[in-house]
């Protein structure tokens, strides 16, 4: 294998590790949001917030990430976050995924 490809793949692997750490951190915060939503009797689903996030991130994405790609990625992130929040609001357990 060409050394240049290996070097680039190594960079991708390092970024993947950073993404995992950030996703874990995001899901931990989502868990806390779920607890507060339960306490305040606020629904988990908040399409307005999701649209605000997509709009903000679309402006930041630039040329290497299309709006369609960004929406697909963050739809999955939102789905996972909402699953955690639903889990927190329907269960008294507090140890999910970590």
PLM region descriptions:
Residues 1-98:
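Domain-level signature for soluble enzymes in the chorismate/prephenate branch of the shikimate pathway
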């Amino acid at each position: 294998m060409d050394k240049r490809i290996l070097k680039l793949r190594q960079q991708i692997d390092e970024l993947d590790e950073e993404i995992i750490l950030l996703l874990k951190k995001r899901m931990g915060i989502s868990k806390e949001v779920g607890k507060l939503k339960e306490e305040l009797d606020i629904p988990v689903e908040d399409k307005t917030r999701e649209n605000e996030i997509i709009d903000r991130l679309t402006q930041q994405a630039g040329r290497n990430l299309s709006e369609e790609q960004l929406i697909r990625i963050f739809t999955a992130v939102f789905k996972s976050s909402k699953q955690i929040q639903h889990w927190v609001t329907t269960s008294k357990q507090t140890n999910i995924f970590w």
